[in-house]
């Protein structure tokens, strides 16, 4: 008997296909076919771990896995949200794997990581949204790999107790990332389970809990936003004290996902970067293939140096 194929997005199955424009020549990526990539994949399977690299169909997976870098996705591979842009499976999640913090730390040690990025699916089914599990993962990695810097990319903990966010921040990540993803006008169609100003307030609260932690947020472009809306998001992020901004091109995972409205040119990305630096961000990454965790290890070193340089000029 053949296994029933997994339907990753049951809520999208009945939708008509949404063809996107053809990708331009500046969007070219390599498949994850290197020996190093095979080793990373095998390690993840052996430790029962998931990566956002695979689950979200990241275009940079070939490059990152060749460098033996991966972004760990905790709390399972099934999300309780159904964002229009995301390739992660939607449905009813299973139990939380209590062994995951240990397996995660084992993998960080085995890969010799100097910087690790930990993200998760949304777990609206959990009382704390998974905050306690984030705390345990951070603590375990810190214990097993004390020289490894830790970056978290969290969900919004919407409708969860105030202490949920504090639980994550107080575990002591070096970088706290929460992506706004798009401009507020597009939230009802692109990110219907979230609220723009809630996410913005979350980033602001992180700095209140720990003023020393680096905060980071990103958006996708090519979804139908205007230039003026992108600049307003930059201003909103700076008002919330965000240190590091990432801007990348939205790429459609399947024909059932929202279509690409347009492909933003490399020159436009450069223009956004120049404007953002002028608004006071410590760091900006803006290019067609920029993703939240792409080159996160190198970016963390640059981020620390940027803060030191800024302090020296005051």
From Swiss-Prot:
Q: Please name the InterPro entries in this protein's record.
A: Aldolase_TIM, Elp3/MiaA/NifB-like_rSAM, LIAS_N, Lipoyl_synth, rSAM
Residue runs in coiled coils:
none
Basic and acidic residues composition bias: residue spans = 294-308
Catalysed reaction per UniProt?
A: [[Fe-S] cluster scaffold protein carrying a second [4Fe-4S](2+) cluster] + N(6)-octanoyl-L-lysyl-[protein] + 2 oxidized [2Fe-2S]-[ferredoxin] + 2 S-adenosyl-L-methionine + 4 H(+) = [[Fe-S] cluster scaffold protein] + N(6)-[(R)-dihydrolipoyl]-L-lysyl-[protein] + 4 Fe(3+) + 2 hydrogen sulfide + 2 5'-deoxyadenosine + 2 L-methionine + 2 reduced [2Fe-2S]-[ferredoxin]
Q: Which Gene3D superfamilies match?
A: Aldolase class I
Q: What is its EC number?
A: 2.8.1.8
Compartments (UniProt record): Cytoplasm
Q: Which UniProt keywords apply?
A: 4Fe-4S, Cytoplasm, Iron, Iron-sulfur, Metal-binding, S-adenosyl-L-methionine, Transferase
Q: What is its main location?
A: cytoplasm
Q: Can you list the GO cellular component terms from the UniProt entry?
A: cytoplasm
Q: In which pathway does it act?
A: Protein modification; protein lipoylation via endogenous pathway; protein N(6)-(lipoyl)lysine from octanoyl-[acyl-carrier-protein]: step 2/2
- Domain Radical SAM core, chain residue ranges per copy: 65-282
Q: Which GO terms describe its molecular function?
A: 4 iron, 4 sulfur cluster binding; lipoate synthase activity; metal ion binding
Cofactor annotation comment: Binds 2 [4Fe-4S] clusters per subunit. One cluster is coordinated with 3 cysteines and an exchangeable S-adenosyl-L-methionine.
Q: Which domain of life is it from?
A: Bacteria
NCBIfam families in UniProt: lipA, PRK05481.1, PRK12928.1
**Family named by the database record:** Belongs to the radical SAM superfamily. Lipoyl synthase family.
Protein name according to UniProt: Lipoyl synthase
């Amino acid at each position: 008997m053949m296994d029933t194929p997994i339907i990753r997005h049951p809520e999208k199955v009945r939708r008509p296909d949404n063809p996107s424009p053809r990708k331009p020549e500046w969007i070219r990526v390599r498949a994850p076919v290197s020996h190093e990539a095979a080793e990373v994949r095998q390690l993840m399977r052996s430790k029962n771990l998931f990566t956002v690299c695979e689950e979200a169909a990241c275009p940079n997976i070939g490059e990152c896995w060749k460098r033996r870098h991966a972004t760990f996705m905790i709390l399972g591979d099934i999300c309780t949200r159904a964002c229009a842009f995301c390739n992660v499976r939607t449905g009813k999640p299973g139990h939380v794997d209590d062994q995951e913090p240990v397996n995660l730390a084992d993998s960080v040690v085995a890969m010799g990581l100097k910087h690790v990025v930990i993200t998760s699916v949304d777990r609206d089914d959990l009382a704390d949204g998974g905050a306690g599990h984030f705390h345990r993962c951070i603590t375990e990695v810190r214990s097993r790999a004390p020289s490894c810097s830790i970056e978290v990319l969290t969900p919004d903990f919407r409708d969860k107790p105030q202490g949920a966010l504090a639980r994550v921040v107080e575990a002591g990540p070096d970088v706290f990332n929460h992506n706004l993803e798009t401009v507020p006008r597009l939230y009802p169609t692109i990110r219907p389970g979230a609220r723009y100003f809630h996410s913005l307030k979350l980033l602001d609260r992180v700095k209140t809990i720990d003023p020393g932690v680096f905060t980071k947020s990103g958006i996708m472009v090519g979804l139908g936003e205007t230039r003026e809306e992108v600049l307003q998001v930059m201003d909103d992020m700076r008002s919330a004290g965000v240190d590091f901004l990432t801007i990348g091109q939205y790429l459609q995972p399947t024909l059932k996902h929202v279509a690409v409205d347009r492909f933003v040119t490399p020159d436009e990305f450069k223009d956004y970067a120049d404007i953002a630096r002028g608004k006071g961000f410590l760091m900006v990454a803006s290019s067609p293939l920029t993703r939240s965790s792409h080159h996160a290890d190198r970016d963390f070193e640059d981020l620390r140096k940027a803060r030191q340089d800024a302090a020296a000029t005051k």
